[in-house]
Regions:
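Short Pro-Gly-centered beta-turn/loop motif in secreted/extracellular proteins
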Residues: 1-2, 9, 180-205
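Generic recognition of long tandem-repeat/solenoid scaffolds
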Residues: 71, 142, 186-188
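Exposed, polar/acidic Ser/Thr-rich sequence context and nearby capping/turn residues
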Residues: 88, 176, 194, 198-271, ...
Length: 278
């Protein structure tokens, strides 16, 4: 007998997993997965599936039934996180003049330049393959996963901030990147290919637009600093979005452009068996 399992169980605002109607499944189920649809990347969830080893012999007598059915869950999405640094070492001179910062303010996946950014797809639990992928129809705001802090102590003129705050990720060192995302926050995206495939074929199949400021402290100026605003698009390199792969990208922010460097592949945890009582 074959059992299938998946997680997460619940859905949120039409997001997550949709299971076929009871009685309509004759073979392995096909599950529809939709990414978080309220445009809140902080609510994105991982998606894992498993099936038991039907060829394995298990003692199903009453005395041993509490042991449950053994499953090995596997990640079927792609996981992305980002760290960032300035493209050059910025001046960190202390005092009245000279300190410069890159302030990352907002970010979004740019739908018009992201043909491989999917809002939904269908996973076949028989072989964990994807089909029926639907391209997103709008930009996807990921600002809520940025590790923003209030930098009003630096940018303190009302015209340069909103709601009496200046929220940004502050970058200073070219040698030491810092994480752009809040701890334990990730993007979970529908993959382009299996783990053994090639991933996306072209740079920019997924493109992220960043709004950022370059701020230089200068007490000789009326407001104590000079600020320039920038909006630039960063293209994920080819080879992204393999199923079950966790990527860590380093982004370089410059005066006129943003570059995403070759990613590192992170450990996404072991695919260790676990028991579920059925």
């Amino acid at each position: 007998m074959t059992f299938f399992a998946y997680g997460p169980h619940s859905t949120l605002s039409g997001s997550g997993v949709t299971v076929p109607a009871v009685g309509s499944i004759t073979n392995a189920p096909k599950l529809t997965f939709t990414i978080e649809s309220t445009n809140d990347a902080a609510k994105m969830t991982d998606f894992v599936v498993a099936k038991n080893d039907a060829s394995a012999t298990q003692d199903r007598t009453h005395a041993n039934s509490a042991s449950g059915v053994t499953f090995t869950f596997r990640h079927v999405l792609s996981r992305l996180t980002f760290e960032a640094k300035p493209s050059v070492e910025l001046s960190t001179t202390t005092g009245a003049k000279g300190t410069t910062y890159v302030m990352v303010r907002t970010a979004k996946i740019l739908q018009s330049s992201s043909p491989k950014f999917y809002k939904s797809g269908v996973l076949d639990c028989a072989d964990e393959s994807w089909s029926g992928k639907v391209t997103a129809t709008g930009d996807y705001d990921i600002t809520k996963v940025l590790a923003l802090t209030d930098e009003k102590a630096i940018v303190n003129t009302p015209a340069d901030h909103t709601s009496n705050k200046y929220d940004a990720v502050k970058l200073t060192s070219n040698t030491t990147p810092i994480t752009l995302f809040t701890s334990n926050e990730y993007l979970f995206l529908i993959p382009e290919t299996a783990k053994t495939g090639t991933g996306t074929t072209s740079a920019g199949d997924v493109t992220i637009r960043f709004d950022y400021d370059i701020v230089t402290v200068d007490t000789a100026l009326g407001k104590g600093y000079a600020i320039t605003h920038h909006t630039t698009d960063a293209k994920l390199p080819a080879g992204a979005l393999k199923q079950g792969v966790a990527y860590k990208y380093t982004i370089e922010f410059g005066i006129n452009e943003v570059k995403i460097l070759t990613p590192a592949v992170e450990n996404w945890g072991s695919e260790a068996p676990g028991n579920i009582t059925v």
